[in-house]
Amino acid sequence: MLKQAESMLKWAIEKDNYTTSEKIGLNDYRHVHESLGIGFIALEDIKEDEKLVSFKKDSVLCLTNSDLAQLPEVQSLPSWAALLLVMATENASPNSFWRPYLSIFPTKERITSPFYWDENKKDALLRGTVLESNEDCNEITQLWIDRIEPIIKLYPNRFSQVSYEDFLRMSAVMLAYSFDIEKTKSPISNENEKSAAETSIKEDKNGDAAKKNEGSANQDDEKLHSQSLVGNNCEVNSEDEFSDLESEVDPDELEKAMCPISDMFNGDDELCNIRLYDINGTLTMIATRDIKKGEQLWNTYGELDNSELFRKYGFTKKKGTPHDFVLIKKEHWLPEYIEKLGFEEVEARLELLCREELLYNLEGDFTFSKADLTFKEICLAFVLMEKEKELISVPSKSDIKPKHYRKLLKIIEKRINMYPKISDPKNFDEENAKTLIEGEIDILQNLSAKVKEALTKNRPKKKQKVDH
């Protein structure tokens, strides 16, 4: 594994115009934890602000750098979907320029995220968690049917070797290793703008796609720690991957890309000592503090909670993260009100809660995090749903009664009982699921304690006997 990663590093430097500092080198960290795989180590002391890796934007795998950018049907895809097709197309070509990079992508068996889990496994290990309804794999399957297959049929010579199975695998890889980088005008796209929209591409005789397509090489197939782009004109965000998450990234300004070498750094938001910056069009990894010889170099994955770490990168942090949260979903509290008021009336009242910023989604889900265990909003929702007449304003805090606190306590108790019991994890999947579950239960128990405290304070005092 280390040898393969070293070969890729050599290729990136010699063939893809990457430069690296002599002060860093690859190291096998599997003895520390299997999820770490291969990472970078400081071979000498490194000073803050030292440049460690640099490369141009034409050295990354993305649609702009691919000859697939000439296809209007591919251009019309979301950035992440276009990147997937580029990756799968390159991987289908034995002579691809990106072969050394593609060869170190994790195999399906080495992907430790729950991307490939079937419904039975999800129910057994993730029931009740934030990830219980995750549909990443199903969404990719639907994308394949609705958007990718028609493109393949339209250009059979170009895409005949692209398989659904490999497209799925590239999805899991991209989820863990992609960056959002600022778009640049490529000769290909400029040419495309001048030509008619129907212009098609001729198949390369040797089957190679242009040098710049995608890849998301993980330093070694097993490393599922994150990589992120931060700094001038760059985004850390890779949360627009699938439709369950709305991206804050402007598709006209940024695009999804795979960056060899940069995605070989393990990531930890707390240990982070390097960052990737865009400096006048050159992407550069810079030390954010002094680093001692022998230290591992850590990129950052941003402010993610444990469920997102597991979903994207296939690992969890034992002690959780400051961003962990739990959901009380509509199905945990709304059914009785729908039965009583009807769906349309409940929906109207949810809209009212949203307008008053007491609820932040029309689905009716409430979020509670480590940092914010405020429960006034859900209690006001109970009060609002109990009203028989149509309302034009939400109730006030004074309308919250002890019965509403007791109702919330019952819901919390039911939520805690929903989780699977994993007392003795037998593998990495069970280990991660157990960590996720314990973190959510901890938040719910803390929430319960705060509600009980409020209930005690608001309990009516018994009338005292007055002796005459």
Curated annotation (Swiss-Prot):
Enzyme nomenclature, EC number: 2.1.1.-
Source species, domain of life: Eukaryota
Subcellular compartments: Nucleus
Region listing for Disordered, in residue ranges: 188-225
Gene Ontology CC, one term: nucleus
One GO process term, biological-process aspect: methylation
Alphabetical list of Pfam families matching this protein: SET (PF00856)
Keyword Nucleus among UniProt keywords: yes
Family under the similarity heading: Belongs to the class V-like SAM-binding methyltransferase superfamily. Histone-lysine methyltransferase family. SETD6 subfamily.
Job of this protein: S-adenosyl-L-methionine-dependent protein-lysine N-methyltransferase that monomethylates 60S ribosomal protein L42 (rpl42) at 'Lys-55'.
Name recorded for this polypeptide: Ribosomal lysine N-methyltransferase 4
Organism: Schizosaccharomyces pombe (strain 972 / ATCC 24843)
